[in-house]
Design a protein with these regions (language model features):
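Beta-alpha junction/loop-to-helix N-cap segments that form part of ligand/metal-binding clefts
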Residues: 28, 35, 50-57, 69-140, ...
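Periplasmic-binding protein-like
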Residues: 98-111, 131-133, 173-178, 231-242, ...
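Short, low-complexity disordered leader/linker segments with a strong preference
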Residues: 1-37, 421-432
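Immediate post-signal peptide segment of exported/extracytoplasmic ligand-binding proteins
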Residues: 26-40, 68-76, 164-172
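Solvent-exposed, acidic/polar segments of extracytosolic/periplasmic ligand-binding ectodomains
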Residues: 36, 353-432
């Protein structure tokens, strides 16, 4: 394993991080002939380290596991780890280094959509493969990216439908609270269109954005309470990302907001983010994901055991983006074996239809739009920082790359197989 850029121990709310050691310089290190190199492109410092450092460790766990089993195509797999430091332009620089200088076969990385958007032109220019493990806003399908997290129809829309229903409390007013960047803004655009189609009036929708790392939540939480005082059942849909979630939830507690009064459903808060928060006043608030550590099945039992043994800390938790990396890495390995090579074009073709029995308890399938079919789960926060699953789909849901709720997306197709061979078109590229 090579690691470039010194890492710092991010404050993962009291969780212990796997220390990373600086070795060689990326600009002078020649390609290693005896290994298959993959890139790990996650922030190990800055505002997103709280979420992304664990994803780096997840890939290292998967690499360790495959090497113990004899490697891939007769070679060891080598992880080349870099730290883009929550700096969006730096993501692109590090991606270019991984592809052009380190000659990695694939990259596993990014969390925020702004980081993914930053690296996308690099992957398309250099024909690299990115496995992106986090829920996002949709509205994209690149032949150089496999999206292993949730699209809006696999998280955001089902969560709002749940809260609108009797089981979820029958919410009538909505606060869409997000960090100010592309994922929250686009997701909320989709949710606003969905809510209005359900005859929710504009006066019953409040939208607010705050910067990354925001901490002064007193005024905004007071505004949420005032908005909810109109008399209709109110719910908060949170697309807040990174370490801003800590003071947000603390201020909810300080303001005496209980889930029975104003439920909050979060799309970027999971077990890792709750690890350092006193959750006794957050019991009953919700998160929507495709996996929770608390689900019971043999595959998840093995996943949790493998993680705790690798990280050498029984208190460390698993979460949804970790499961997405688990699925993505296994699918990449299967595709490489099927293709008999790490060649990007050959592996891409072999990815379609790959199946992995996932820790969620379901079998995930890679579709020709480069998105997974995944189950949807809604969990309630427990006192121990875990989640009780209160609702889930019966079967995996196929991701929509383009939203049926946006008029401008009407007729758009993402299908990278013949005759379409495109990620954003209204007619097939090839016709007989």
């Amino acid at each position: 394993m090579k690691i470039f850029q010194g890492t710092c121990r991010a404050a993962l709310f009291g969780a212990t991080l796997l220390a990373a050691t600086v070795t060689a310089n990326a600009q002078t290190s020649p390609p290693t002939q005896g290994t298959i190199k993959i890139g790990v492109l996650h922030s190990l410092s800055g505002t997103m380290a709280i979420s992304e450092t664990t994803l780096k460790d997840t890939i290292l766990m998967m690499v360790d596991d495959i090497n113990k089993k004899g490697g891939l195509l007769g070679k060891k797999v080598e992880a080349v780890v870099v730290d883009p430091a929550s700096n969006w332009p730096l993501f692109a620089e590090k991606a270019r280094d991984l592809l052009a200088k380190e000659h990695v076969a694939a990259v596993f990385g990014c969390w925020t959509s702004v980081s993914r958007k930053s690296v996308l032109p690099v992957f398309e220019e250099l024909n690299g493969l990115l496995f992106y493990p986090v829920q996002y806003e949709g509205e994209e399908s690149s032949k150089n990216v496999f999206y292993t997290g949730a699209a809006p129809n696999q998280q955001a829309i089902p969560a709002v439908e749940y809260l609108m229903g009797e089981e979820g409390g029958g919410a009538k007013r909505w606060v869409l609270e997000g960090t100010d960047y592309v994922y929250p803004r686009t997701t909320n655009k989709i949710l606003e269109a969905f809510l209005k189609a359900k005859e929710v009036g504009a006066e019953d929708i409040r939208i607010n954005y705050t910067p990354f790392g925001y901490s002064d939540w007193q005024t905004e939480v007071a505004a949420i309470k005032q908005f909810a005082a109109a008399g209709k059942k109110t719910a908060v849909v949170s697309t807040i990302n990174g370490d801003a979630n800590v003071p947000f939830y603390k201020e909810l507690s300080n303001a005496g907001i209980k889930a029975s009064d104003i439920p909050v459903v979060a799309f970027s808060v999971g077990e890792e983010e709750l690890a350092g928060i006193d959750t006794k006043n957050l019991i009953g608030h919700l998160a929507a994901w495709n996996y929770f550590q608390s689900v019971k099945n043999p595959t998840n039992d093995g996943f949790i055991k493998q993680w705790k043994e690798f990280i050498k800390n029984p208190k460390r938790v698993t979460n949804d983006p970790m499961e997405a990396h688990y699925i993505g890495f296994k699918m990449w390995v299967q595709a490489v074996r099927q293709a008999g090579t790490t060649d990007v074009d050959a592996v891409r073709q072999a990815m379609y239809g790959q199946k992995v029995k996932a820790p969620s308890g379901f079998t995930s399938v890679m579709n020709t739009n480069h998105h997974l079919s995944k189950p949807v789960m809604i969990g309630e926060i427990r006192p121990d920082g875990q989640f009780d699953v209160v609702w889930q789909t019966k079967e995996p849901i196929k991701a929509d790359a383009w939203s049926p709720h946006l008029p401008e997306d009407k007729g758009k197709v993402a299908d990278w197989t013949y005759p379409w061979v495109c990620g954003n078109c209204t007619a097939a590229k090839y016709t007989d």
